[in-house]
Amino acid sequence: MKSRLTLIARAALCMALPLGGIAASATPASAAAYTPLPPHVYAPYYETYLAPNTPSLTATAQASGVRYFTLAFLQAAKKGSCSLDWNSSSTMPLDYYDADIASLRALGGDVIPSFGGYSADHSGTEIADSCTDVSQIAADYEQVITTLGVTRLDFDVESNSLNNTAGIARRNQAIALTEAWAAANGIPLQIQYTLPVEQYGLDPNGESVLQSAVAQHAAVTSVNIMAFDYYISGEGTVGMGQAAINAATSTHTQLASIFTTASAAQLWNMEAVTLMPGIDDKKTGNEVTNLTDAQTVVSFAQANNINLLTIWAVQRDNGGCVGKAGSNTCSGIAQNSWDFSNTLGAFTG
């Protein structure tokens, strides 16, 4: 299932690129410095754009018991740029979290940097939408890997990015180049796509992202579905745990038609699920994920050997704003701090 370009193909690709492309990209540390994630991991999204008015990764880990985080988001400095910052902010360069990540690793944790996100995907500052130079996009990805010392990259593709066919192709071409570079340097790189979903599975444009990955020889380790914000009509309460299972099951069927050489078990292991604790962005408040839903999803993930669970986002994992929908800093339901992380954290191992 997980194919990589051979070094011969890599050399051919690099010869076809302009001077100053991948050949000039970041130099990796020893391969021994790159530690793969656990086979099953809970890695909630951490909203970097709340900095500096949010606890650090290390402080959050110490308070919550969480050890793995998905950092949202790396974005182009501005539309048309080929350089990356956290949240397109010049005050948050790529190495902004270096010391914090080192402290987190001392606790036994690690991070997954995530590219894109709704605001970048909507505004054109997702790096593959913004930059038209595939070799430079790949160099950016490689710099993230070497600067942060990570082994998994997450690509959150939604909004306008789902329909940007040129950006989709560039992203997957750059991923393929980066995978070949990582393989040549002994780095166990994993690629994760995070995509919006309905209970019937991925929309056609989400499927197209993955079909492009296959066409461009970009190996995808994980497909992470955003199991929230369905905007289901009506006011009846939606069972969000079962809705997530429905979405994951439907996605499994779709993946079988895209990754045609993979077994059913391998396809389940490709899947990941993101929940949104409490009230999601649908303002009527009938899409509410509670702790029972979270436990339902954990049991399903364990039974099917899914590779990752996460939430949007760890800063929301508290009951500080009961009744409020779509907050960045609280779930909107009555709960203790870290209830969702305590429930989902049992999945790691």
Q: Where do the language-model regions lie?
A:
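A structural signal for short secondary-structure junctions
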Residues: A265-L267, A303-N304
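Chitinase-like catalytic core of GlcNAc-active glycosidases
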Residues: A32-I225, D229-I258, Q266-A272, M276-T292, ...
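Secretory targeting and sorting signals
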Residues: M1-A31
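Residues that scaffold, gate, or flank divalent-cation-dependent active/transport sites
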Residues: A313
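Short, low-complexity, polybasic intrinsically disordered segments
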Residues: N286-L308
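Noncatalytic modules at the cell exterior or secretory-pathway interfaces
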Residues: F69, L308-L309
